Each structure stands twice: as structure tokens, then as C-alpha cells.
From Swiss-Prot:
Residues 54-95 form the bZIP domain. Transmembrane segments: none annotated. CDD domains: bZIP_YAP. Transcription factor that is required for infection of plants hosts. Is not implicated in the development of appressoria or the subsequent penetration of host leaves, but is necessary for the initial establishment of the fungus within plant cells by orchestrating the expression of a unique set of early invasion-related genes within appressoria, encoding secreted effectors, enzymes, secondary metabolism-related enzymes, and signaling membrane receptors. Controls the expression of targeted genes by interacting directly with a 5'-TGACTC-3' motif present in their promoters. It is found in: Nucleus. It comes from Pyricularia oryzae (strain 70-15 / ATCC MYA-4617 / FGSC 8958) (Rice blast fungus). This is Transcription factor BIP1. GO terms for cellular component: nucleus. Residues 82-89 are annotated as: Leucine-zipper. Keywords: DNA-binding, Nucleus, Transcription, Transcription regulation, Virulence. Residues 1-73 are annotated as: Disordered. Residues 61-73 have a biased composition (Basic and acidic residues). The gene is BIP1. Disruption phenotype: Impairs pathogenicity on barley and rice plants, as well as on detached barley leaves. Does not affect the differentiation, turgor build-up and maturation of appressoria but impairs the formation of invasive infection hyphae and completely abolishes the ability to penetrate into barley and rice epidermal cells. Has no effect on conidiation, mycelial growth nor resistance to cell wall and oxidative stress. Residues 7-22, 47-56 have a biased composition (Polar residues).
Length: 266
């Protein structure tokens, strides 16, 4: 007689629910801890406001106010620094725009100058610099000074010859003489002979120092000694020595002589 033995291969028993779905045995109904929803872990050192005493709560609120005040101060400082940086950037941009505008105007003026030079036939300098470089070139200055007076550069007006008249005349004027000729005329307003005048040069030669005192006109004289008609001192009638007459022929410059006319001898 065969006996029915329950199978031991599977120890799992299936229980059907009223809806017909199989339900595992209580052995498999045990869930793992990871399957359960995790609860937020509390940080150490934190306490709930509800558990604080009134003094602790007041101190906590004071600390919070101080922290918020510091945060607001830092935020305000940061905003002011950003505003200053923005203003600096704007000013730099304005300076750059002004510089660009000046550069554009400078280029326009250079083009206008070049056009005017071309219109009036003025030679354009080799560089675009508004000033001629030859002004600051030492070699150009030395070469210009070493050149003759007849050659002139086109940058300068020609100057008339030295000694020419400054007034513009229809006929060319003669150049000035460097030395004036000495005049041989004894006196411009005299009609008498040469012996009637006392010729006294300002630079007396050494041979005339020994002349007698009678040949010289005295500085002090009375009214009777003067000629009433002309106001000249009367002649004393003393003949001049031959040495003085010989010295009279020396060439003396015209500007260094002094003439003292005398009245004719009575």
C-alpha cells in the first residue's frame, strides 16, 4: 500500500487570498530594513525652539539679529564696490570714445591739409607729421648755416643783400660803403686862409706836446679880447712854428678833429 508523503523539496506554502492572488508564507514576509522609508537624522548639537528656555530663546534671537546685521553690511559693501567698478569702466569707455573721436578729427584735418597743399602747389613733407622734421634736425641746421647767402631754401623768404636800402625803390640802390673817406676840407663855413684858424686835434701827437703856450687859445679871457661882431677871440698875431705846420699834414680821421675858427688878423 503506497503511502502519500508530503514533498520536502519546497517548504514554501502558498496561501490564496480571497481575491485569488497567492500570498507567501510568513517566512518570506519579513522585509529588509532598506525597504522602509528613511527618517531624517537629527544633527547633534541642535535643539528645537520648543525645548528652549525663555532666556536661551532671547539670546538666540539676539545672535540671529547680529548675524543678519553683519550679512547686510557685507552685502551693502559688495554692492558699493560693484557700483564703483561700473563707474570706472564707464569712465574708461568715455575716455576711449573721446580719444577715438580726437583721432578721427586729426585724420580728417591731415586729409584737409594734404588737399590744400595739393590745391596751392605746396610740396608735401615726406612724413605725415604736421611739423617739418628739418627744424629739429641738427645736420639740416648746420648744412643750412654753412651754405652761401645766395642760396635759400624754399621754406624761408629771401632776405636782401647786406647794406641794401630797406625802402623799396624803382631803381636798385647802391650798397653802403664800409669805410667813410676822410675829408680834406679845413672848415665847411670858412672862406679865409688856413693860417687864420687854430687846428687842434683831439689826439695830439707826441711832437706837439712841446709847443709854446702862446700858440694855444686860453680858456679864460676877458670881454675886450673877443671880437664884438663875430664873438670869436682876437688873433694874437703869433706865427705858428714850422713843426706844428708839419704835423698838420698827418692823416687824422675826420671824426677826431675839432676846428676853432678865428677872426682875420687886424
Amino acid at each position: 500500500m503506497a503511502m502519500y508523503m508530503p514533498s520536502t523539496a519546497s517548504s514554501t506554502t502558498h496561501i490564496r487570498s480571497p481575491s485569488g492572488t497567492p500570498i507567501d508564507s510568513p517566512h518570506e514576509m519579513t522585509r529588509s530594513p532598506s525597504a522602509e522609508p528613511s527618517k531624517p537624522a537629527k544633527r547633534k548639537g541642535t535643539r528645537s525652539v520648543s525645548t528652549l528656555t525663555p532666556s536661551q530663546l532671547a539670546r538666540k534671537r539676539a545672535n540671529d539679529r547680529e548675524a543678519q546685521r553683519a550679512i547686510r553690511a557685507r552685502t551693502k559693501e559688495h554692492i558699493e564696490r560693484l557700483e564703483r567698478e561700473v563707474e570706472e569702466l564707464k569712465s574708461k569707455q568715455n575716455r576711449d570714445e573721446t580719444l577715438q573721436e580726437l583721432i578721427r578729427k586729426n585724420k580728417y584735418l591731415e586729409k584737409e591739409i594734404a588737399r590744400l597743399r595739393e590745391t596751392y602747389g605746396i610740396p608735401t613733407p615726406p612724413t605725415s607729421h604736421p611739423y617739418a622734421p628739418s627744424i629739429y634736425d641738427d645736420s639740416a641746421v648746420s648744412s643750412r648755416t654753412s651754405s652761401s647767402f645766395g642760396q635759400h631754401s624754399p621754406d624761408y623768404h629771401q632776405v636782401g643783400e647786406y647794406g641794401a636800402s630797406y625802402m623799396t625803390t624803382p631803381e636798385p640802390s647802391e650798397p653802403w660803403t664800409s669805410v667813410l673817406p676822410c675829408s680834406n676840407v679845413s672848415s665847411p663855413a670858412s672862406s679865409g686862409s688856413a693860417e687864420e684858424y687854430g687846428y687842434i686835434p683831439t689826439s695830439v701827437p707826441a711832437g706837439i706836446e712841446g709847443l709854446p703856450p702862446t700858440s694855444r687859445v686860453g680858456a679864460c679871457m676877458k670881454y675886450e679880447d673877443m671880437d664884438n661882431e663875430n664873438g670869436y677871440p682876437r688873433s694874437n698875431g703869433v706865427p705858428m712854428p714850422p713843426t706844428y705846420m708839419h704835423q698838420q699834414q698827418w692823416p687824422v680821421p675826420y671824426s677826431a678833429t675839432v676846428y676853432y675858427p678865428q677872426s682875420p688878423a687886424l
